[in-house]
UniProtKB/Swiss-Prot annotation:
Native species: Salmonella typhimurium (strain SL1344)
Cytoplasmic side: 23-204, 247-339, 678-710
InterPro entries attached to this UniProt entry: IgaA (IPR010771)
Periplasmic side: 1, 361-656
The protein's name: Intracellular growth attenuator protein IgaA
Function: Involved in negative control of bacterial proliferation within fibroblasts.
Transmembrane annotation, as ranges: 2-22, 205-225, 226-246, 340-360, 657-677
Length: 710
């Protein structure tokens, strides 16, 4: 439900954003030439302003009817107000002026970037580098109604009847009419190569791509509910980065270049010329700004009529036959090594995060098996599995009867807290060999016999046979004493169990004291000779409890040792067969867990608990399914097969995504690392190569062959 709500909210937000963008574009579409000025503002035209504009247009129309010096009237400029003239556009921009050959006294044309505007000629003296301009739209050209605080209202009030004439410029950026005329040959858009010089180096796009890599990584460790949104965001970031790097520029992004013809001349430092330029060269009234590396070559065209392409900001894009920014980029492409470095570093960062935070073994194996087209195997017998030919990546569905594996201490790899210890039921030995018999132990039998003998004499039951009469036993019990009515049997069973000298030392000393013997060997000889038959020993309750504890502690090591030895004796399966293991440690049997782990039992109960466990797990039903992650055969001929649980659909996609992301990061790091190194080397020599190219074009060297010298 939360996913649906998030989706609906995101869809609603996108719809509102799209509606807002559409309304903004439609509002700007009503004035199509406004799109050239992104920072323009608009307001309504006031009635008094409209009246001043109409008066100015009437005066302009009358002036255009006056014949010029040659007797011809100026070509009429149709400036007629329309419905869109009620909107005033306010902007701050530079004004570019071009001269034309005409009899019209107002022979200048004015441009705001690529938009030609009509500027009242009496305002030419107020033109600055940056101008506060207010425009309205007419049927032909936008009309300037205010320039740097000067309005048509002021003009009509203060200079009514003033003749429209060209006012000589007093600003240093505009030279007088005596300046040489330049010819405007063409207005074109800059080429893609010329645009590349002003285009950013792509650092922002590289950061977007790295951010998309990081989002792809976090998709692997976030909950499934957020994964689609994060993948969508990562794809959008990646697409935005790639689009910014490789998409061709839009037509609106390409600046206009004016193709001029004139005679460039060097002028002294004056007025508004750029003081940072080494060479101060002008074309007519236009102060040219050259690329710094062109300085050695531009003097060849001085004083000669030359074709020059310039931007509206007076930067030169081409001059003469050879100097050309377009040819530079075409023959010596720009080397953006920094963006390749950023992408390579970002790829390495994500790769290290994958190596240290995400287990890669299973994703790689699953992806490779999926690409190879692994098979699905179902088997209920050992022979069926042998015929199938198991390979890594296969999917297995197995069921049958087998034995839970027992590990030796040196090779223990199962769960340390396995409920079936010492059996590991996450590994099943499956073969056709007969089941092993239940383990037996003489030492355990002897220890149990000793414990039972002492327990029977210390805690007699009425139905037990006794060498002492019932009345005497009752009298002894009433007195608070404890009677051992067969002391010799205890000595013999102790000697049978503890044959070594260093075994049961404390128990032997206690029995020697009770038997009033010189040492243990003498006591055993007396017992073997039958001299202890019929000997009764009276014990205080404290002494009886101490004797019972001594027997318990003396027999415990024997039983524990024999239990461990018996478990290891089962760790010898028949040759051949299979060992099916879950690499996640999952139990492969459906057995009830023991209420108490084996080694939590008292030593005297461990043996019987182990036998019950062995009887259950030495031939138990099992079922195993999963994907094969490893297959090998040991020296005993047993084939070891490791299984990993079959992932769900989400798990499959995560494994596949992990592998693909790792491969993509490796390829990206290697490719962009190499590209960064190569581009950096070329970037260092690019300017020298360009200058060498210009030297060869402008100052060619003639090579004379030896044959011509003869």
């Amino acid at each position: 439900m939360s996913t649906i709500l998030i989706f609906i909210a995101a869809l609603l937000a996108c719809s509102l954003l799209a509606i807002w963008r559409f309304r903004v574009k439609s509002r700007r579409g009503s004035l199509p030439w406004i799109s050239a000025f992104q920072d323009a503002q608009t307001r309504k035209l006031l009635p008094e302003e409209r009246s001043a504009v109409e008066n100015y247009l009437d005066n302009l129309s009358q002036i255009q009817q006056v014949p010029g010096p040659t007797g011809a009237s100026a070509a009429p400029i149709s400036l007629t107000l329309n419905a869109e003239s009620n909107s005033v556009v306010i902007l701050t921009h530079s004004i570019t002026r071009y001269g034309i050959t005409t009899d019209d006294p107002n022979k200048w044309r004015y441009y705001l970037d690529s938009v030609e505007v009509h500027l009242p000629p009496f305002w030419e003296q107020y033109i600055n580098d940056e101008n506060n301009v207010e425009l309205i739209l007419t049927d032909t050209l936008p009309l300037v109604i205010s320039l740097n605080g000067h309005t048509l209202q002021e003009y009509m009030q203060e200079s009514r009847g003033y003749a429209l004439q060209n006012t000589a410029s007093t600003q240093a950026s505009i030279r007088g009419e005596e300046s040489e005329q330049i010819e405007l040959l063409n207005i074109r858009q800059e080429t893609h190569e010329e645009y590349a010089l002003s285009r950013p180096a792509g650092l922002r796009e590289a950061l977007l791509i790295v951010a998309s890599f990081l989002l792809f990584f976090f998709c692997l460790i976030t909950p499934d509910v957020f994964v689609p949104w994060m993948i969508g965001g990562a794809i959008l970031l990646l697409a935005a980065g790639l689009w910014g790097l490789f998409a061709p520029p839009s037509k609106s992004a390409l600046r206009e270049i004016h193709c001029l013809r004139g005679t460039p001349r060097r002028w002294g430092l004056f007025g508004e010329n750029n003081q940072e330029q080494i060479n101060n060269i002008s074309l007519g009234i236009i102060d040219l700004i050259y690329p710094a590396h062109w300085q050695p070559y531009i003097t060849q065209d001085l004083g000669q009529q030359t074709d020059i392409d310039i931007y509206l900001d007076r930067h030169v894009a081409r001059q003469g036959r050879f100097l050309s920014l377009h040819d530079e980029v075409k023959n010596f492409p720009l080397q953006h090594w920094l963006r390749s470095t950023v992408i390579a570093i970002g790829s390495l960062l994500v790769l290290f995060m994958l190596l240290f935070w995400i287990p890669l073994d299973m994703p790689i194996k699953f992806t490779l098996s999926w690409m190879k087209g692994a098979q699905t195997i179902e088997a209920t017998t050992v022979k069926q599995l042998e015929k199938a030919g198991v390979r890594v990546g296969d999917t297995l569905h197995l069921s049958g009867k087998g034995m839970c594996n027992i590990h030796s201490g040196a090779t223990w790899s199962g769960q340390s807290n396995s409920p079936f210890m010492p059996f590991d039921c996450s590994q099943i030995i499956w073969n056709d060999a007969p089941a092993l018999p239940l383990p037996e132990s003489d030492l355990v039998n002897k220890a149990m016999a000793l414990s039972q003998a002492v327990n029977r004499q210390l805690h007699p039951k009425p139905e037990d046979d006794s060498r002492v009469s019932a009345s005497l036993r009752s009298a002894i019990q009433k007195s608070g004493m404890v009677l051992l009515d067969d002391f010799g049997d205890i000595v013999l069973k102790t000697a049978d169990l503890c044959a070594a000298e260093d075994e049961c030392v404390r128990l032997k000393n206690a029995l020697v004291n009770l038997g009033n013997s010189k040492d243990w060997n003498a006591l055993v000889k007396r017992a073997n000779a039958g001299k202890l038959d019929g000997v009764n020993v009276l014990l205080r309750p404290v002494s009886a409890e101490s004797l019972e504890n001594l027997v318990t502690t003396s027999t415990a090591p024997f039983i524990s040792r024999e239990t461990a030895r018996a478990a290891q004796s089962l760790n010898s399966p028949a040759p051949g067969g299979f060992l099916i293991a879950s690499d996640e440690g999952s139990e492969l049997v459906d057995q009830t867990w023991p209420s108490t782990p084996l080694y939590d039992y008292p030593a005297q109960e461990q043996w019987s608990a182990f036998q019950r466990l062995a009887q259950t797990l030495m031939q138990t039903p099992f079922s195993a399914e999963g994907i094969v992650t490893s297959v090998y055969t040991d020296a005993n001929g047993t084939q070891h097969i490791s299984l990993h649980r079959i992932p769900d659909k989400s798990g499959w996609w995560r494994y596949l995504g992990t592998t693909l992301l790792m491969l993509a990061m490796i390829v990206s790091a290697v490719y962009n690392g190499i590209q960064a190194f190569r581009r950096y080397q070329r970037h260092r020599t690019r300017m020298a190569d360009i200058q060498e190219y210009y030297e060869s074009c402008l100052n060619p060297r003639l090579t004379v062959s030896p044959e011509n010298l003869i």
